[in-house]
């Protein structure tokens, strides 16, 4: 009796007394034998394990305890049974010995080939092993695989075979060095099951190749992994994964606890937001501006741009306070329903900027009225900007703040309200009271178009402006504002040849208020008056608001839509 058998019996008596495990095997199915010619090995099935008390069976049965799972078995290809020392019917396993060659000799791996086989090297440098003159019987064992044993991460990979040691850890036998390896390194892995004739398995931390069928002369050797070898590696992989996961979770919890102890202030206190530069927002917009579904024009203005317009009007007090500061400006979020007295003060006191200068001029009276705002506590959402223009114009269109901070929003809101009132009158059929005052020209030097081409082309608005207004815009100079020039003729007179007066010549005659309202070109003038504010000088939020107002204007004239940049 061998040492392994004695050790197995000792563990049996110490662990479970007279209770022993009887191992039986199950042969391969006849269909598999017919398909591949000769049967290959089959691993022990759990259903074949039976427990019988107080008796030790004969030589056909293997006696092992349940707790003793590290016993390695040999497999008999003829009986399709596992055994420890020898098969009850066919005796001990048959080994094919290598040709003895000292370690360190060049090309040692090819010289260790057993008799009856040879290593064939192709012209491309690839090597292969084949049987030459004798049939290799089924069940013969080649090996062990020789090479340098190392951990898994140090293995070469292609010529390495994984093994599981006694401590259930991975190791590899690296056969990349031809001076230390043997001929088994040249055996090619089979590409499909029908061409395989060898099965690789592990026994006592060594790798062996077993012939699963007869190998005839001229046939090349092809090896594949045995079923028990693959299951062993798979079970070890699962255990390693679970162990690493449990270990990683414990380490993560420990690191979090240590971090919480080192930085207790992270668990409480307000969140510090990053400081903005150049008026850019670090947060992306959560919606695409072009994906808004078209709705009723009035409802669109009320629901979508109401808060924007209110915030634009109320932001005047914040801007006035910013203009009074000499250092970098701090723009704060203004409450939604705050009183707009400071916005009116900023509008009436004439906050302006010289076109050639970068400094903003604010009268002292306005700065004194805005004094109490400086004592207010700054909100955490405040951010810094270098100038009001950079706060609105330098930012990316896709990274806009939720409200507008451009200095023109107050005047834009006032104009929007006036236009909405006029449109309501047009819609209801009421006539406005004739104005006794001469028309006022809204001077907006910062909205000037030096070339005049952009404004004149945009005022056409896809043909919605009457021909008389179109003539004014094309022939007139950029210094004249469309706010002060109503159309010279009725729409039915705009098609005549002499219907286009010149802005550069004599003054354009005025029309009566009734004629103004009846003129279908009135909607074009309204669009032109409002679109002057959009010549690349206002913030994109205001531009979207004006776009909706223009849609409302066009709806009165036939359902056309506004196309703004």
From Swiss-Prot:
Tissue: Widely expressed, with the highest levels in spleen, lung, mesenteric lymph node and kidney. Among splenocytes, predominantly expressed by B-cells (at protein level).
InterPro entries, per the entry: PRDM11_PR/SET, SET_dom, SET_dom_sf, Zinc_finger
Keyword Ubl conjugation: yes
Top-level taxonomic group: Eukaryota
Cross-link (Glycyl lysine isopeptide (Lys-Gly) (interchain with G-Cter in SUMO2)): 54, 121, 138, 166, 180
PROSITE patterns in alphabetical order: SET
Region (Disordered): 371-399, 477-506
Keywords of the record: Cytoplasm, Isopeptide bond, Methyltransferase, Nucleus, Phosphoprotein, S-adenosyl-L-methionine, Transcription, Transcription regulation, Transferase, Ubl conjugation
Enzyme class, UniProt record, top EC level: transferase
Gene3D superfamilies, per the entry: SET domain
GO molecular-function terms, A-Z: chromatin binding; methyltransferase activity
Record localization: Nucleus; Cytoplasm
Family: Belongs to the class V-like SAM-binding methyltransferase superfamily.
The protein, known as: PR domain-containing protein 11
